[in-house]
Amino acid sequence: MENNITLEEIQNFKGKYPKQLWYLFLVEMWERFCFYGMRGVLAFFMVDQLGLVEGKANLQYGAIQAFVYAFTFIGGIFADKILGFKKSLLFGGIVMILGNLLIAASPHDFFYYGITLSIIGTGFFKPNVSSMVGELYHENDGRRDAGYGLFYAGINIGGMLGGAIPIYLGKNYSWSLCFLSAAIVMIIGVITFLLTKKHLAPIGNSPLEKHEPKKRNLYEIAVYVGSFVVIPFVYIMVINSDFTEYFMYTMGIVALLYFAYELIMLKDGKQQRKLLAAFVFIFGYFMFMAISEQSGGSLSLFAKDNLSNKLLFFHIDPNVVNNSINSLYVVIFSPLVGLLWIFMAKRKIEPNTVIKFGLSFVLLAAGFFIFYTARFFVNQDGLSSLDVFALGYLVYTLGELCIGPIGMSVITKLSPKRLFGMMMGLWFLSSAFGQFAAGKLGAEISDANTGTTLMSKLIAYTDGYYQLAVYSLVAGIALIVLTPLIRRLMQEVK
């Protein structure tokens, strides 16, 4: 049973946050535990347990992550046109649970089969929670950014726990327990959604509600069946990363054509300019992800072999630090950065959204430069300081905080309501291309190591991080220079 509450009543909430945001916060938190838990073990597991060389593992990692995010674009379209956000989320969550349970049954035998299910499930789940958050607010509600800030904190609490617990269980107990933990928290997330979705009332309902039930059910069943029909094809592409390029290029062309079609169909100059501005942010996010998403690939492998296990006065697994410290920093510093923007806004000196995007690249460059300096803190065994590594992540995270919480918010501000799902899908698709590019960059970093010692690996990897710092700095400066042009496209949107 759905509550009789109307959309207008939801959007006219009192206070800072609507209660529905807290429910979506919890659902997303558990799903992010599952996602980041898997992400944090991918490259490590493939090298340590499946015996892949590091360059190949980076490519495989990039391919898997690319498929995950590419399918969010497809899932967003099906949610927009047929299923609605609620049914899409529920279906995706169940498929993700099945994928993790399959791997947990026999990690070495069923790894790629389970990953295939997780890719499809995440595609249906991921874009929908953030889209429903956007619908909790009126178009010009100034509380929207604060809502996405809280939602972003939920993502990172899940990411922090997911980054630390599964890899710890896998390395110290069993890999079956590692993947089982991801399945268990996903079950909690799905149950949470089932118990609270009535409070969302019309938000996320099927766009085909007014169609006759028989016709609507036929469309929905076709989506579900089609999702399982493509499993063999996705599996083949996952185990053969050479196919990834063909898939990504095809997906990119289709996505651009579909975006162009929807842009033309708007037939409203103001809306078209706003949608073009949204596309600029989406492309910027692609560049950011291509550089920053080394954390699950090359940085994970760097932490595996080239970092000491001492952080300040504590002993801790470097891979636990690599997988979770970024999310920990986000939880700690996200509200502080939010307060900084408020402080600056009161004094009318807050940078606009485009400048914030540019600053994110500058800080990302500084973070990777600190990773590069790890070579100056190395001992005779080729182990560098975990403290320096953690400092690099702190600066890197401050850059992320300039783009992450406001990114999804600005996309929903610039997009017509009927295109929310597609534009959030494009946002995640840009991440898919970023993940794909990150895998290639990580593979180049690994392949540059022609030696056999930990010291030669450290030199090769830190050289790569220096190059990434340069790329990021150039991108940041370019965005800042182009700010006036992009602001004109955005019109009244801040």
Model-derived features: where do they sit?
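Short amphipathic helix-loop junctions that connect adjacent transmembrane helices
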Residues: 38-58, 295-322
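Cytoplasmic membrane-interface "Motif A"-like loop-to-helix N-cap segments
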Residues: 81-93, 271, 343-362
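Glycine-rich segments within core transmembrane alpha-helices of 12-TM secondary carriers
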Residues: 68, 143-163, 170-171, 183-189, ...
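Intracellular juxtamembrane helix-capping segments at the cytosolic ends
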Residues: 124-138, 402-415
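C-terminal ends and interior cores of transmembrane alpha-helices
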Residues: 91-112, 358-381
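Intracellular loop-helix junctions on the cytosolic face of multi-pass helical membrane proteins
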Residues: 1-19, 139, 170-300, 304-310, ...
